[in-house]
C-alpha cells in the first residue's frame, strides 16, 4: 500500500495565508495540515508516500525535510504547470506510481479524525471512496449510492441541485484504489479523458465515467459522525479550528461566536430559549414564496416599521421603536441616554452592563442558591443607593426569577416616587404561565408610567432569532423620537419587515406562539 497526496494547488481563496506557502502548510490550532496528515500516515504500513507538488513546491519539500524519514519513505513529483492545470493533471503525472501498488489517494487540504485511515483500510472492498451525508457546509463533488453502497454516479459541482440534497453524499476526498483497478480501469480512462478534454479538469470526472460501466466495483464507505473538514478559505479554516480544538478551547471558541451555529450541524445549543413551534408552516411558506421579491427589494424606513411594530403589539406608533434585535436598542439606550448610576441585578444578561462604565453600576446579588428576589427586595436594597435607573429583566435571564405584573407596577410606582427610571426587559415573558397577559406592552400601562420603559426581543417566543427584531417602548415620545433618529434608516431587512407584516393576518395572529 502506498499513499499519493495531491498538493500542487495555489489555494488562492486563503488569501494572505498562502501568499508564500502551500495550502497544506496552513495551520489549524498550531499544526500544519501536512504535518497532521503525515503524522497520521506514520501509523499506516506504507511502502511509500508520493506527494505531487507545484505551487511553492520547493518550500514544501524544505518544510517537510527529513523529519519523517524514519517512518515514511517520501517521494515527490513536480507539476510545473500548476497554474494552468487542475488536479487531474497532478494525478496523471503520478500514474506510473499509481499502477505499482494499492493506493490511498488523499487531497492535502483536509483535516480529519485519525480513525479514517483505519476505517478505509479495514474495509474489505478493494476500491472505496469515503463519503459523508450531505450537510449545508459541504461543497464540491457529490455522489449517489444504492442500497448496497455502490456509487452509481458522481455529481460534479456544476450539476448540483438543491432539490436533490436528501440523496447526496459528499466525497471526503480520501480514496482507496486497488492496483488492479488502477491498471485496468482508472489509468486507461484517465489517459483517455485528459487526451480528449484536457488537463484543467478534476480527477473525480474520471470516476464519474468509470461508475457508468456495468461492472464497476466502486463502493462508498459512509462516515458515522467522524470529524472532517475541507479547507478552501479563511472561513473553513476558522470552522475547522473550532471542530478540531480541545474541549476547553472548543467551548471558548463556540462562546465567542454568539451564533451562526448552523455551521456546526451536530451542535445542540441550550443557551438561548427559542420557541421551536413558531412561526407556523403557513408563515414559513409565505416567506419562501416571497423570497425573490424580498431579496431584491429595499425594506421600509422607520416610519413604516414602527407602524408595523405598534400594530404587532397593539400600542401607538409614537410609543415604540423597532431595532435590529433588542441588542441594537440596548446599545443606544445604555450608551447614549444613561450617564448616572444604574441598578443591575446579578447574574444578568451581559449586554446591559457591558454598555456601561463599571463605576455606574450598582449591583445587587440575591443571597440564595436560586438567585431569587422580589420587588420588595429590590426596593429595600436600592432605597438609599440614589440610582437614576433600575434595570429589571423579567423573567430574569439567566436565573428565571419572575415578578408578577402587579408587583412590577408596584415597583414602578416606587421608582416614580424615587425619581428613578425603570427599564423592564420582558423578552421571556411569553414563556411564563399566563404568557402575554403578563406583558407591560399596553398604551394604558405605558401612559400611566412615563418613567418606565419596556424592552422586548422578538426572537425568543416567536422563534425568529435570525431575523433580528426587537422593540423598545415608552410613552416618553421625546425619547422615542430621539432613538428613531439614532438608528440607520434601514435598520432591519426586508425579510424581518415582511415577517411583521404577515404576522398581522388574522389566521396567524390568532395563533398564540407559546400556549396554544
Residue positions per predicted region:
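N-terminal glycine-rich phosphate-binding loop and ensuing alpha1 helix
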Residues: 1-58
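Short loop-beta-helix segment that forms the pyridoxal 5′-phosphate
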Residues: 72, 298-299, 310-332
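Active-site pre-lysine segment of PLP-dependent enzymes
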Residues: 119-123, 373-384, 398-461
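PLP-dependent aminotransferase class I/II
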Residues: 171, 301, 451-516
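N-terminal "arm"/small-domain region of PLP-dependent enzymes with the aminotransferase-like
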Residues: 242-297, 385
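PLP-dependent aminotransferase-like
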Residues: 335-392
Amino acid at each position: 500500500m502506498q499513499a499519493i497526496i495531491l498538493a500542487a494547488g495555489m489555494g488562492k481563496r486563503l488569501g494572505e495565508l498562502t501568499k508564500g506557502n502551500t495550502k497544506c502548510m496552513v495551520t489549524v490550532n498550531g499544526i500544519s495540515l501536512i504535518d497532521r496528515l503525515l503524522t497520521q500516515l506514520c501509523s499506516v504500513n506504507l511502502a511509500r508516500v508520493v506527494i505531487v507538488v507545484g505551487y511553492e513546491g520547493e518550500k514544501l519539500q524544505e518544510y517537510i525535510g527529513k523529519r519523517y524519514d524514519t517512518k515514511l519513505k517520501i517521494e515527490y513529483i513536480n507539476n510545473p504547470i500548476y497554474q494552468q492545470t487542475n488536479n487531474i493533471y497532478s494525478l496523471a503525472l503520478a500514474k506510473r506510481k499509481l499502477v505499482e501498488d494499492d493506493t490511498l489517494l488523499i487531497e492535502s487540504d483536509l483535516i480529519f479524525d485519525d480513525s479514517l485511515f483505519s476505517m478505509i483500510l479495514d474495509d474489505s472492498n478493494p476500491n472505496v471512496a469515503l463519503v459523508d451525508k450531505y450537510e449545508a457546509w459541504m461543497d464540491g463533488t457529490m455522489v449517489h449510492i444504492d442500497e448496497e453502497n455502490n456509487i452509481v454516479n458522481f455529481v460534479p459541482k456544476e450539476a448540483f441541485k438543491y432539490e436533490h440534497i436528501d440523496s447526496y453524499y459528499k466525497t471526503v476526498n480520501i480514496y482507496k484504489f486497488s492496483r488492479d483497478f488502477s491498471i485496468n480501469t482508472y489509468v486507461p480512462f484517465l489517459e483517455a479523458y485528459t487526451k480528449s478534454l484536457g488537463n484543467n479538469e478534476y480527477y473525480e470526472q474520471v470516476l464519474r465515467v468509470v461508475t457508468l460501466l456495468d461492472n464497476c466495483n466502486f463502493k462508498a464507505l459512509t462516515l458515522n459522525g467522524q470529524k472532517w473538514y475541507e479547507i478552501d478559505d479563511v472561513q473553513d479554516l476558522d470552522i475547522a479550528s473550532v471542530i478540531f480544538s480541545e474541549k476547553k478551547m472548543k467551548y471558548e471558541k463556540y462562546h465567542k461566536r454568539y451564533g451562526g451555529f448552523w455551521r456546526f450541524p451536530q451542535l445542540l445549543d441550550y443557551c438561548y430559549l427559542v420557541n421551536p413551534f413558531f412561526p407556523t408552516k403557513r408563515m414559513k411558506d409565505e416567506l419562501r414564496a416571497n423570497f425573490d421579491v424580498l431579496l431584491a427589494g429595499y425594506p421600509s424606513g422607520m416610519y413604516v416599521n414602527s407602524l408595523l411594530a405598534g400594530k404587532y403589539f397593539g400600542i401607538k406608533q409614537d410609543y415604540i421603536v423597532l431595532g435590529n434585535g433588542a441588542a441594537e436598542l440596548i446599545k443606544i439606550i445604555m450608551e447614549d441616554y444613561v450617564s448616572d448610576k444604574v441598578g443591575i441585578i446579578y447574574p444578568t444578561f451581559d449586554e446591559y452592563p457591558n454598555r456601561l462604565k463599571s463605576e455606574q453600576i450598582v449591583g445587587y446579588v440575591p443571597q440564595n442558591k436560586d438567585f431569587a428576589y422580589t420587588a420588595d427586595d429590590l426596593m429595600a436594597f436600592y432605597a438609599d443607593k440614589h440610582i437614576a435607573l433600575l434595570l429589571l429583566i423579567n423573567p430574569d435571564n439567566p436565573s428565571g426569577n419572575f415578578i408578577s405584573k402587579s408587583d412590577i407596577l408596584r415597583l414602578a410606582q416606587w421608582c416614580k416616587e424615587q425619581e428613578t427610571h425603570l427599564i423592564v426587559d420582558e423578552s421571556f415573558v411569553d414563556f411564563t404561565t399566563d404568557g402575554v397577559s403578563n406583558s407591560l406592552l399596553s398604551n394604558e400601562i405605558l401612559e400611566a408610567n412615563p418613567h418606565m420603559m419596556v424592552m422586548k426581543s422578538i426572537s425568543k417566543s416567536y422563534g425568529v432569532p435570525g431575523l433580528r427584531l426587537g422593540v423598545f417602548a415608552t410613552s416618553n415620545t421625546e425619547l422615542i423620537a430621539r432613538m428613531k433618529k439614532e438608528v440607520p434608516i434601514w435598520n432591519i431587512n426586508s425579510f424581518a419587515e415582511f415577517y411583521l407584516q404577515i404576522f398581522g393576518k388574522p389566521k396567524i395572529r390568532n395563533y398564540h406562539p407559546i400556549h396554544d
